Amino acid sequence: VEPSITTAPLNDAAPFLYYAQSGDMLSAVAARFGVSESEIISDADLTKTTLIDPGTLLVIPNRINEPTTPNVQLLPDAEFVFSATSIGFDTEKFVKDQNGYLSSFRDYLGSVGWVQGYDAIDRLSVENSVSPRLLLALLEYEARWVRGQPIDLLHTEFPMGFNDYHYKGMSVQMTWAINNMSIAYYGWRAGTITHIEFPDGTRLRLDPRLNAGTVAIQYLFSKLHSESQWSQIINPDSGFPALYNEMFGDPWARADLVGPIFPPGLIQPPLVLPFEPGAKWSFTGGPHNGWGQISPSTYGQSHSIYSAIDFAPAAAKSGCVPNDAWVVAAAPGLVIRSENGV
């Protein structure tokens, strides 16, 4: 008897007609749609640049055979990162004008001591490259800190609702939220995130056509809310997007004014190690996230935000000691910020 041959079931659904978004890489798009790179068809040469030019039409087989999140864009990428849309936004003035709990709140930061709450928001925005508007909207949605008073004692001490004594206080709560959103945002860019998981273990596949900013929002709210609550939160007419519009106006209009984050035709420039040719330095650590620790027990075993590697010049003593060796730029460009820890 000849053995029977079983073939995988075919999905008869029509292929996706997907228009590339700013920041899309071929490998990441393939991972999000669950296909191989060679199966993606386009009239454009997708290997010519590091990123696919925005608006490029891609024909992609439909291999999605499981429930997905809604294909509704909630937040443009330019309103997630600390981009040109934040130019001119005065966090202190906005918070004081709202006259809520945050306007008189002070927080303690280990690096600088006691600071005003709005200054802490600005610091978190700059250090993590996240829009201050987004942080304020999250703080208002979850805890009513910006325009009123905390909704209860839990949200006074844990404003994002993450009830863990290691994360007590506004800045550490916002750091928790930022880290989760960044895991999703950059994971979507890299093609390493495809699903969200709710507290009860239920999973949903992220619609592959979403932008990274939307994925960050969907991912964060799935961490502490049930699927039914989450569905209400992401409702653009009555949930978090509606609150965001109410507080700050149309984010998509601001994003359109500044254009895509990544210009068309972008090619990754070559990078060099950050020390002079011939100098002896040691590779001392990394890759790791830029600020604090991404604990696997909090964020999951497979998630991190790789943004830094560590080098140290040769020295007579071990440990952190002053050194006059030059640090050089990894690529041509402007130095736009130099502070402690940077």
Model-assigned labels for residue ranges:
Residues 25-27, 64-66, 141-146, 167, ...:
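Solvent-exposed loop/turn segments at secondary-structure junctions
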Residues 2-36, 56-58, 62, 81-123:
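Primarily a LysM-type cell-wall glycan-binding module
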Residues 25-28, 32-35, 39, 53-54, ...:
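Extracytoplasmic/secreted proteins, especially bacterial periplasmic and envelope-associated proteins
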Residues 49-52, 65-67, 133, 143-153, ...:
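Secretory-pathway/luminal and periplasmic proteins that interact with or process carbohydrate-rich
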Residues 252-341:
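Surface-exposed, glycine-biased beta-strand/turn segments
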Residues 163-284:
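Non-catalytic cell-wall polysaccharide-engagement segments
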Residues 79-120, 127, 134-209:
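Peptidoglycan-targeting cell-wall enzymes and recognition modules
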Residues 31-35, 42-45, 60-63, 126-130, ...:
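Sec-exported extracytoplasmic/periplasmic mature domains
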